[in-house]
Design a protein with these regions (language model features):
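Rossmann-like adenosine-cofactor binding region
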Residues: 239-319
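Phosphate-coordination loops involved in phosphoryl transfer and adenosine-cofactor binding
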Residues: 81-86, 191-193, 301
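Phosphate/diphosphate ligand-binding glycine-rich loop within oxidoreductases
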Residues: 79-184, 312
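Short, structured coil segments at secondary-structure junctions
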Residues: 108, 138, 158-159, 215, ...
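Positively charged, low-complexity intrinsically disordered leader regions
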Residues: 26-99, 103, 171
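Glycine-rich phosphate/diphosphate-binding loop of Rossmann-like nucleotide-binding domains
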Residues: 91-103, 185-266
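C-terminal helix-to-coil terminal segments
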Residues: 24-30, 322-360
Length: 360
């Protein structure tokens, strides 16, 4: 089969899947009155949040706007998702992700069920498509935290209900949305602000790149040679940046990245699943530690960010993470509000615009 014919078949299949999801969603929300006191400007609809690319600039704007409204007026949304159920399958341990999804769903009037998959992969006992077709008959939305992005993409392909990426080896979209909500609260419009990320070009770095691009902001990512972000993610972010005016810089010098920046972000040098590389990484990454000396090179008003859990004494010192500049717990709190907005919008809480899906 030629590449063009194969691509056509994939496109046709993806289109049918979007129609199936929209039909299912419409059935769910028929006759339901929106619980929010006002419509959200520029609200989007997309079948899943597998990647930040699914949202695009309008979607990122909608999520962040609604998250701010929900944070300010939680009582207005207490029955927004009454009668709705979500299922969460986590192949990796979690504190913030699990509890913020559970608490968020309950605060919207719905229920959340958690399945611990840390002992085996989600598709270990049966075909992933079979799992998807079971789940779509029981719940309204599926949340996955997995080692492989392919697992999340496969679930989204087969399930007729929305699927949310709660972390994979490739992306962490919910985290990046919460991070930029935190920055918007601190600085307002991000158009003239710069985020410097130093460390491993991992899933968090990928989602920050894409979210920054959607917001038209500036991001500098400094990593050791060989640990740069995924080239396809970078290409996608730069494509979005052409539309929004965002500026993306990939560097190897952490000092160049941090100079004058408004926010300094780092993450673990060794992610879950990379334990065999820990000794080597611990030798390579020390120049990228965020300490008081590096923070001093940023703007005087700069904040320190970390998605947590932090390995104190490695990627960040106690003096920095415990300083007044640190907003790590604000980030953690905003996971709740960003994910509430995602749940609400993916379950039909606003006007729908044409779907935009990276995995379709």
């Amino acid at each position: 089969m030629s590449q063009s014919v194969a691509a056509g078949h994939r496109s046709q299949s993806a289109g049918m899947q979007v129609q199936k999801k929209e039909s299912t969603l419409n059935t769910h929300v028929q006759g339901r009155v929106a619980a929010a006191p006002e419509r959200v400007p520029q609200v989007f609809w997309c079948p899943d949040l597998v990647s930040t690319r699914d949202l695009g600039p309008a979607g990122v704007d909608a999520v962040l706007h609604l998250a701010g409204v929900m944070k300010a007026r939680p009582a207005d949304f207490r029955r927004a998702l009454t009668g709705r159920q979500i299922a969460m399958f986590f192949e990796k341990p979690s504190l913030r992700t699990r509890l913020t999804f559970e608490a968020g769903m309950v605060s919207l009037g719905g229920t959340a069920m958690f399945v611990d998959q840390t002992h085996e992969r989600l598709d270990a006992r049966e075909k992933l498509s079979d799992v998807a077709h079971n789940l779509e008959r029981w719940v309204d939305l599926i949340v996955l935290r997995t080692f492989s992005q392919q697992t999340i993409e496969g679930m989204a392909q087969h399930a007729s209900v929305p699927v949310i990426n709660a972390l994979s080896d490739l992306e962490h979209p919910c985290q990046a949305l919460a991070d930029y909500l935190t920055l918007l609260e601190r600085f307002g419009d991000m158009k003239d602000r710069c985020l410097a990320y130093v460390g491993d070009g991992n899933n968090v770095a990928h989602s920050l790149l894409l979210t920054c691009a959607c917001l038209g902001s500036t991001i500098r990512v400094a990593t050791p040679v060989g640990y740069a972000p995924d080239p396809q993610i970078v290409a996608d972010a730069r494509e979005i940046a052409e539309e929004t005016g965002a500026e993306i810089q990939l560097l190897t010098d952490p000092h160049e990245a941090v100079a004058g920046a408004d926010a300094i972000y780092t993450d673990a040098w060794t992610s879950m699943g990379q334990e065999r590389e820990e000794d080597e990484r611990t030798k390579i990454f020390p120049p990228y530690q965020v300490n008081a000396e590096l923070m001093a090179e940023a703007a005087p008003h700069a904040v320190f960010m970390h998605c947590l859990p932090a390995h104190r004494g490695l990627e960040v010192t106690d003096a920095v993470i415990d300083s007044p500049q640190s907003v790590v717990f604000e980030q953690a709190e905003n996971r709740l509000h960003a994910q509430k907005a995602i749940l609400y919008l993916l379950l039909g809480g606003g006007d729908r615009l044409p779907a935009r899906s990276a995995h379709a």
